[in-house]
From Swiss-Prot:
PANTHER family assigned: INDOLE PRENYLTRANSFERASE TDIB-RELATED, PRENYLTRANSFERASE ASQH2-RELATED
Lineage: Eukaryota, Fungi, Dikarya, Ascomycota, Pezizomycotina
One GO process term, biological-process aspect: ergot alkaloid biosynthetic process
Stated name of the protein: Tryptophan dimethylallyltransferase 1
Family: Belongs to the tryptophan dimethylallyltransferase family.
Name of the gene encoding the protein in the UniProt record: dmaW1
Length: 448
């Protein structure tokens, strides 16, 4: 046991001593994020070989696409991925012990006149992943990319006419689900800028693109039509008061980068009303889902709501991004996504508890209680330690920005719960005497 623990501890340090970095930005990204990445892989019981492979892929294929290392004063591309505009986020499926990460690929042209809205860097990043693992299929990615992101002419026009103000500039992200020593690649696409270019709403673009796809792939059509009917009925009777019948708006879309016969489409909806009745409505599609599995999942949602002590209210996304190091004083809207499975007439919901801005120790304790109640004993015993060791120099009792979202779904009589986590300046940061500090609970270096 002692030898195994020692071997685990050596992965990040061994790779750090072995790796050469193309520049200081990449070196800083590695030492800022890899300690937490390693700790999560250990918590989820990945083998030593898998840890080396995933951290190696991260260093060689992902870090070169994270752009300049963020500081308070330096110019950088701001990503919608986090409230601080950082382009990388780790997440953990606690029920299946699967580590994931999401990033927005950035390259030297991003934000310049060559690619003012970061439309094209993702293609370069994809080439790296295709080289490292077989089975990646770009058919649906290419389709949605064409339908929902800017082409070169649209990008040039919006930039030259200065038409982009406070809109979400992120157009696409990549995510890797780490299964054993392999990964499953998926994409997330935001059509906000396409909406500006075409004059169509995000809702029209998202649902229109999936509707057209469903005409060709009829196996997802019944689920799509049920979801569309739900959204239309909700929005027909939406209000702006404190009822749960607020307007549902499309935010983004995702799909797996595998064969279209196996790929899933997910449509994400923003729910401004944070309340248990609103979440129940999202979960049941306004009463359209009423089978036993739905009811069992609903009971767990109610349990989580109570454990987390969620504060209800009407929310909106604040603007602009939070400065690095800022302590949040905000709570965000809720969200849900709906998976369109082949040959399943009912969309599968996944709801999100927006816990960003809530006390992280209280969230951790609530999750640990949930894990114990549902006999996820291994995760219950490790979760708190994983986060403490990821941020060892922080006053964990006072933090309120480590947890961003908690997602929940329930299928085949089994719950699935994931946490989405702040993944910046982790481990014994700063590693170097000249290291930059943005998040430091003990002192705040205002010069960085």
């Amino acid at each position: 046991m002692v030898m195994a623990k020692t071997l685990h501890q050596e992965v990040y340090h061994t790779l750090s001593e072995t790796f050469d970095f193309a520049n200081n930005d990449q070196r800083l990204w590695w030492h800022s994020t890899a300690p937490m990445f390693e700790k999560m892989l250990q918590t989820a019981n990945y083998s030593i070989d898998a840890q080396y492979r995933h951290l190696g892929i991260y260093k060689s294929h992902v870090i070169p696409f994270l752009g300049v290392y963020p500081t308070r004063s330096g110019e950088r591309w701001l990503s919608i991925l986090t409230r601080y505009g950082t382009p990388f986020e780790l997440s953990l499926n606690c029920s299946d012990s699967v580590v994931r990460y999401t990033y927005e690929p950035i390259n030297a042209a991003t934000g310049s006149h060559l690619d003012p809205f970061n439309t094209f860097a993702i293609w370069e990043a994809l080439k790296k992943h295709i080289e490292s693992q077989p089975g990646i299929d770009l058919e649906w990615f290419s389709y949605f990319k064409q339908e929902l992101t800017l082409d070169a002419n649209e990008s040039t026009y919006l930039h030259s006419q200065n038409l982009v103000k406070e809109q979400i500039k992120t157009q696409n992200k990549l995510a890797l689900d780490l299964k054993g020593d392999k990964f499953v690649l998926k994409t997330y696409i935001y059509p906000e800028l396409k909406s500006v270019a075409t004059g169509k709403s995000v809702q029209e673009l998202v649902f229109g693109s999936v509707r057209k796809l469903a005409q060709k792939h009829k196996s997802i059509r019944p689920a799509f039509e049920m979801l569309e009917d739900y959204v239309q009925s909700r929005n027909k009777f939406s209000t702006t008061d404190d009822s749960h019948n607020t307007l549902l708006s499309s935010r983004l879309l995702s799909c797996d980068l595998i064969s279209p016969t196996k790929s899933r489409v997910k449509i994400y909806l923003l729910e401004r009303m944070v309340s248990l009745p609103a979440m129940e409505d999202l979960w049941t599609l306004g009463g359209r889902r009423e089978d036993q599995s739905t009811i069992e999942g609903l009971e767990m949602i109610r349990e989580l709501w109570g454990l987390l002590n969620m504060s209800p209210g009407l929310r909106a996304y604040p603007e602009p991004y939070l400065p690095l190091g800022a302590i949040p004083n905000e709570q965000l809207p809720s969200m849900a996504n709906y998976t369109l499975h082949h040959n399943d007439p009912i969309p599968e919901p996944q709801v999100y508890f927006t816990v960003f801005g809530m006390n992280d120790m209280e969230v951790t304790n609530a999750l640990t209680t949930f894990f114990m109640r549902h006999e996820w004993s291994d995760m219950a015993s490790k979760y708190k330690a994983c986060l403490r060791e990821s941020f060892p120099h922080h006053d964990y009792e006072a933090l309120n920005y480590i947890h961003s979202y908690i997602s929940f779904s329930y299928r085949k009589n089994k719950p699935y719960l994931s946490v989405y986590l702040h993944s910046f300046e982790t481990g014994k940061w700063p590693v170097f005497p000249e290291g930059l500090i943005a998040f430091d609970a003990c002192r705040r270096d205002l010069t960085c």
